[in-house]
Amino acid sequence: MSRRSTAEKETAKSDPIYRNRLVNMLVNRILRHGKKSLAYRIIYRAMKNIQQKTEKNPLSVLRQAIRGVTPNVTVKTRRVGGSTYQVPIEIRSTQAKALAIRWLLGASRKRPPGRNMAFKLSYELMDAARENGNAIRKKEETHRMAEANRAFAHFR
């Protein structure tokens, strides 16, 4: 066994404008090819768009959207005796939040082309805050899969 102590989890840093960790997590997930300033610009434009459309605090809309998309359980593929099973497992809150952010960004990227990413992201966040949209559908689909495969929960 290793004698080294386990490394402490580094807490996520907060972004410069909203001073929020969620926004920074979103920026780091939207980041492509190391262009962080572009990622920040996309997020801040999306937040500004949310502010104009809903006249609410964009941070509260973001929190509500992520809370709505965050899954409680997920399915993991497990191979037992030559056959594979989708085994439902509970996931930790940090992992669930990361999944929610990934689903939100994936759903906003899949929105019809023609508008920029900030526009698509803002509409996906507003939809998720209102409990509809593709990211919410993805969460419900995952929960349905977990419910359907509940019989295999003992394979953990």
Swiss-Prot record:
Q: Which domain of life is it from?
A: Eukaryota
Stated family: Belongs to the universal ribosomal protein uS7 family.
Q: Subcellular localization, per the record? A: Plastid, Chloroplast
Keywords, alphabetical: Chloroplast, Plastid, Ribonucleoprotein, Ribosomal protein, RNA-binding, rRNA-binding
A biological process from GO: translation
The organism of origin for this protein: Stangeria eriopus (Natal grass cycad)
Q: How does it assemble?
A: Part of the 30S ribosomal subunit.
Name used for this protein in its record: Small ribosomal subunit protein uS7c
* Summary of the function given for this chain in its UniProt record: One of the primary rRNA binding proteins, it binds directly to 16S rRNA where it nucleates assembly of the head domain of the 30S subunit.
Principal localisation: plastid
Q: Give one GO term, molecular function aspect.
A: rRNA binding
Q: Which GO cellular component does the record give, naming just one?
A: small ribosomal subunit
